[in-house]
Swiss-Prot record:
Disulfide bonds join C369-C400. Keywords: Disulfide bond, Hydrolase, Membrane, Protease, Serine protease, Signal, Transmembrane, Transmembrane helix. GO terms for biological process: proteolysis. GO terms for molecular function: serine-type endopeptidase activity. One of its GO terms (cellular component) is extracellular space. It is found in: Membrane. Residues 1-17 form the signal peptide. InterPro entries: PCSK9_ProteinaseK-like, Peptidase_S8/S53_dom, Peptidase_S8/S53_dom_sf, Peptidase_S8_subtilisin-like. Its EC number is 3.4.21.-. May be involved in the degradation of proteins for nutrient acquisition or possess a regulatory function by proteolytic activation of proproteins. It comes from Encephalitozoon cuniculi (strain GB-M1) (Microsporidian parasite). This is Putative subtilisin-like proteinase 2. Residues 221-475 form the Peptidase S8 domain. Coiled coil: none annotated.
Length: 535
């Protein structure tokens, strides 16, 4: 009986002992998971998968073998917790028994993949704009190419051009893209075209560009500056007579955000400006005082940051949001920058849909064809002239400039100068023509600009003047009038009065000098007269 009892106890231990070890193994893993989770640094979570941790009873295994398996599992989990893993948010302990053998996830399943991104751009990473010649809106192959270069896609373009912008640290991006038959260029930074200067009203200057005598050289003399003749004439005596206001024309401005104003809005929904450039451009375009197109609608593509800079990729993305206006429309760029085939292609596409595109030539005193978007064949590229209709020292020049307009001495209450202001003035004058001819083609617009511009004294470039448009069958110009008299009569009167005053002062001075000299001579005669001999 003793031996029978020992056999029964051994059998029970064989059955219940294995189960106990199995249960303890799972419980031990749970405890280890909780303890390890407390010791883990923030951001690392150890999670138990119930379905994977339920082990089937290994009926053919001995207790020693089961104990060995338990130690192996614990060792494996501890190693994975203690090993540093950057960028990993979860570590899953995977243990599974298949029949008599244990199949556990190897270390490769717990290693972070190469595609995991931390969200930061490394110092060696560069950003690019990738496009293809055929505009079909399909970017799938381009995205696959970017992924093969270990890059991350930032933007996709499907409306004006087909392309993507991406960043990659791959050292051979240009060659890989060329082999794929696509066009790639590095992302660039574009800046607003502005400088600083003290300036009066630009319309007043435009009015005197062609005058022979009463030109801006005449009004710029020191006497007129001291007496503030120009300010008196523009503020108190002058009135701008116009017959068209650009009504029904939609103007889109790519620039910094603008402050709240009637007839204008930021497409991003922002209500305040953080840079004065956008406000000045808006004032020149649709301002009730300083703009030609006083009744045009202005929408601002406010993709330019507060520093006056915008990346090429963000600018192209902003142009994707350019909506159909249902009427004549003008796109005005407030920025210029390095030559970009991608930007030029996008601008050409926009122009082909009937939108008039006006851009600044740039402020680098360089060849204009080296800059975009002004080098695009479909853009009206505008340079800057000074108050004497001479090309500004900062303005770009060359064959890619269509015409010039005032870029210095533009507004009385602003210190900004630059070719972007010139572009705004030209765009505002085009809006007047589109009001009367909403379906005008580019040759007609160019003819209108030719009629309302003049060639400089050397005949080498065209300068915009105050527009002349038809009104009830007549061609009348928008001019300044001073109390019903022609404008030049008033300065002529000023000249006569000032000349008379100067002559009067000169005569008074000569007269006083002569009297003083005579008095001095008389005093000398009295002082040195010899005494009279009375005897």
């Amino acid at each position: 009986m003793f031996f029978v009892g020992v056999a029964v106890l051994a059998a029970l231990q064989s059955v219940w002992g294995n189960g106990g070890l199995e249960t303890n193994e799972v419980a031990g893993m749970d405890r280890l998971g909780v303890e390890s989770q407390k010791e883990n640094p923030p951001g690392i979570l150890l999670r138990k998968d119930d379905g994977m941790c339920e082990a089937r009873k290994p009926m053919d295994m001995s207790p020693g073998e089961v104990q060995t398996e338990t130690k192996t599992v614990v060792k494996e989990i501890v190693v994975e917790i203690e090993e540093p893993r950057e960028g990993i948010q979860e570590v899953l302990p995977v243990v599974q028994y298949e029949g008599q053998a244990k199949v556990s996830a190897g270390n490769d399943l717990l290693k972070p993949s190469c595609g995991v991104s931390s969200g930061f751009t490394s110092s060696a990473e560069r950003c690019y704009v990738l496009t293809k010649d055929a505009h079909d809106g399909d970017t799938s192959k381009m995205i696959s190419l970017v992924e093969s270069l270990s890059g991350r896609v930032k933007r996709q373009y499907t409306k004006n051009i087909t392309g993507v912008s991406f960043c990659s640290s791959h050292s051979d991006v240009l060659r890989k893209v060329d082999d794929a038959g696509m066009h790639v260029e590095e992302d660039k930074i574009y800046t607003v075209s502005m400088l600083q200067n003290n300036i009066p009203n630009y319309m007043y200057l435009m009015r005197h560009y062609e005058n022979t005598i009463f030109n801006n050289y005449f009004y710029d003399n020191w006497i007129f500056r001291v007496l503030q003749i120009k300010r008196v004439m523009t503020k108190f005596l002058g009135s701008y007579e116009y017959y068209h206001t650009g009504k029904g024309v939609n103007i889109f401005l790519l620039d910094t955000a603008i402050s709240s104003m009637d007839g204008a809005c930021n497409l991003s929904g922002r209500l305040e400006a953080c840079n004065a450039h956008g406000n000045v451009m808006a004032e020149l375009l649709v301002g009730k005082t300083n703009g030609f197109a006083k009744d045009s609608r202005l929408s601002v593509l406010d993709v330019v940051d507060c520093d006056g800079k915008v990346a090429l990729s963000e600018m192209i993305h902003g142009l994707e949001g350019l909506r159909e206006s249902g009427g004549p429309s003008i796109l005005v760029f407030g920025v210029s920058g390095p030559y970009s085939a991608s930007l030029n292609s996008a601008v050409d596409r926009i122009s082909s849909r009937g939108t008039v595109v006006v851009s600044p030539a740039g402020n680098s005193h360089d060849q204009s064809c080296n800059y975009s978007p002004g080098s695009s064949k479909s853009v009206i590229n505008v340079g800057s002239v000074d108050k004497h209709a001479g090309i500004s020292r900062f303005s770009n020049h060359g064959d890619c400039i269509r015409m010039f307009a005032p870029g210095e001495d533009v507004l009385q209450d602003s210190s900004l100068t630059g070719t972007s202001l010139s572009a705004a003035i030209v765009a505002s004058s085009i809006a007047l023509f589109l009001e009367t001819s909403p379906r005008a083609a580019f040759p007609q617009i160019w003819g209108y600009l030719n009629q309302n511009s003049f060639w400089n004294s050397r005949g080498s470039y065209s300068v915009l003047k105050i527009p002349r448009l038809g009104c009830k069958g007549r061609i009348r110009g928008s001019i300044f009038r001073l109390g019903g008299l022609y404008e030049d009569i008033v300065p002529l009167v000023f000249v006569v009065l000032i000349t008379s005053a100067l002559l009067y002062l000169l005569l008074i001075g000569i007269r006083r000098f002569r009297r003083r000299r005579e008095q001095e001579l008389h005093d000398e005669d009295v002082l040195f007269d010899p005494p009279v001999d009375r005897f």
